[in-house]
Amino acid sequence: MFPLDNSRRFLWLLVLLFGCFLPCLADLKVLVRLEDGQLTEENLQADSDKDFITLEFRKTDGTFVTYLADFKQDVKIFHVLILGELERGQSQFQALCFVTRLQSNEIIPSESMAKLRQKNPHAVRQAEEMRGTDTLQMDVAINFTKGVQLTPHIHNICAEAKEAIYTRQEDVRLWLERGIDGSMFEVLPQPSSIPSLHPCKLCPQDWKPCICSYHLSLEWIPCSLKYCKNRDSSVKTTSYRCGIRSCQKAFTFHFYVAQKQLCLWDEET
């Protein structure tokens, strides 16, 4: 038997040892105000071992949004699960996946995210920096089975959107240079090649192909680290991490659909 003091030291040593080998996980809940003025809760999770971050929230109309940043592959995924309009012949829900490159300044590293701790979850958070809206032409379809080459998370995040996974030609060119198999990509019809292809909101027939648009906004994301300056006794100035900076970022995706029936929400925009 260990003496009491030795037992405590032994248990503390085990905690330290296991803490070195187990992945560092974080789960934060942030209350934010959506573009329509309603409140929702963002759930942010980070896995520093697998090096990715997810952000999830539900919009006022019931749409469920998942954003995933894969730092190992420099890829981000937007998954949108939209409730269908049953009275107009749609299925119970419709899933979309948008896959594109992850830029270096979009969100803090997973290791930094995993170190954040929950503070005052009932306070409504407002982003410190407004980064505007990116308009993305998602003119290429991704084969679900082969998409794992881009990021293994596609099979988990986009399982409900196997026939609706989109990316951009400019991203495809970069991935091809990196040796990604080009057979997973299919260039979709565009108005430049088919003049009769119009935006879905201008298309009068539900069965005609058109260019659909979908807008979403991430109201609060930890986009960068804050650094403070410290001056020591030798009057030497050093910098150290002292917090995070939050940002708001919106996206508008334009993509081809085989019939307007798959883009009924565009009538309301």
Curated annotation (Swiss-Prot):
Keywords: Signal. The keyword Signal applies. PANTHER family: OUT AT FIRST, OUT AT FIRST PROTEIN HOMOLOG. Belongs to the OAF family. The keyword Signal applies. This is Out at first protein homolog. Residues 1-26 form the signal peptide. It comes from the Eukaryota. InterPro entries: Oaf, Oaf_C, OAF_N. Pfam families: OAF_C (PF22873), OAF_N (PF14941).
